Curated annotation (Swiss-Prot):
NCBIfam families: AmmeMemoSam_B (TIGR04336), PRK00782.1 (NF001987)
Protein name as catalogued: MEMO1 family protein MJ0403
Pfam families: Memo
InterPro entries in alphabetical order: MEMO1_fam (IPR002737)
Signal peptide segment: none
Species this protein is from: Methanocaldococcus jannaschii (strain ATCC 43067 / DSM 2661 / JAL-1 / JCM 10045 / NBRC 100440)
Family, as annotated: Belongs to the MEMO1 family.
Length: 287
């Protein structure tokens, strides 16, 4: 019997009632900080990498919606797309790098893991363990799923996921994980999307946060994962998911990606009006 991973932050980070959740996702798309358009029907042509924030939808949902709007233009429902979602481990539970199989439940329906991809990953990449403990209370991957499920409900795409939770975010680990994501995607001939779930600077004044965030955004747009790691360390940037972003960039470059584009940037202060201690949010696409 398949393991079921139940939502940990439904009713906290996003509504737990399906109708309210759909309304909120639609509001994120149409918000002044969002793409101001609903998702569209597109065509899958090549691997896609995305940077997505993972705070409560009221704070970062409109920025997050930019990534899913661009994704909608680059996927279709003709066959399933495997979405590898890399998130940091905020709980301190579980293994250093943890992948999980089974089913992830959302208020909008279940999302299945790509079991074959998951098995190949933990068997071939020594740093990755098959471990559900890290995932049970972790929000960074979970908050991406309602946006994916919403695209399915619109018949824009069909998805399976590979959820990877990273407590270890050192450069060598992140690059190795990224390399194996690309290697297995090629071996299994998967349609592939790689999402790095990360917020940027945490709880600093707007002026400082925006300057620090500009540094890491520049590194991401230059697809320079080594520089990103060094800047996070040297400038003491409190970006929670730099490891997932490094892994995403490595995977995408290995899969032939050539360019990255910033889709949107804002801080929690732009939403709340309190600029004294903000969190930075960005969406970007790599292809």
């Amino acid at each position: 019997m398949n393991k079921i991973r139940y939502p940990a932050v439904a009713g906290l980070f996003y509504p737990s009632h399906p109708d309210e959740l759909i309304d909120m996702i639609e509001q994120c798309y149409l918000h002044k900080f969002g793409p101001k358009s609903m998702p569209v029907h597109g065509t899958y042509e090549k691997p896609i990498g995305l940077l997505c924030p993972h705070a409560g939808y009221v704070y970062s949902g409109p920025i997050q919606a930019h990534s899913y709007y661009e994704l909608s233009k680059r996927v279709d429902a003709l066959e399933e797309t495997t979405v590898v979602i890399l998130g940091p481990n905020h709980t301190g539970l579980g293994s250093g790098v943890s992948v999980m199989d089974g089913i992830w439940r959302t208020p909008l329906g279940d999302v299945k893991c790509d079991e074959e991809f998951v098995e190949e990953l933990w068997r071939k990449c020594e740093i990755v363990d098959l471990d559900e403990t890290a995932h049970l209370n972790e929000h960074s991957i979970e908050v991406q799923l309602p946006f994916l499920k919403h695209l399915e409900l619109l018949n824009i795409a069909k998805f399976k996921i590979v959820p990877i939770c990273m407590m270890f975010q050192d450069y060598e680990t992140a690059v190795e994980v990224g390399y194996f994501i690309a290697k297995i995607a090629k071996e299994l001939n998967r349609r592939i999307v790689v999402i790095a779930s990360s917020d940027l600077t945490h709880y600093e004044p707007q002026e400082i946060a925006s300057k620090k965030d500009a540094i890491v955004i520049k590194d991401i747009l230059e697809m320079n994962e080594k520089e990103l790691y060094e800047d996070v360390v040297n400038y003491n940037i409190s970006m929670c998911g730099y490891g997932p972003v490094i892994a995403m960039l490595k995977a995408m470059k290995t899969l032939g990606a050539e360019k990255a584009k910033l889709l949107a940037y804002a801080t929690s202060g732009d939403i709340t009006g309190d600029y004294s201690a903000v969190v930075g949010y960005a969406s970007a696409i790599v292809e």
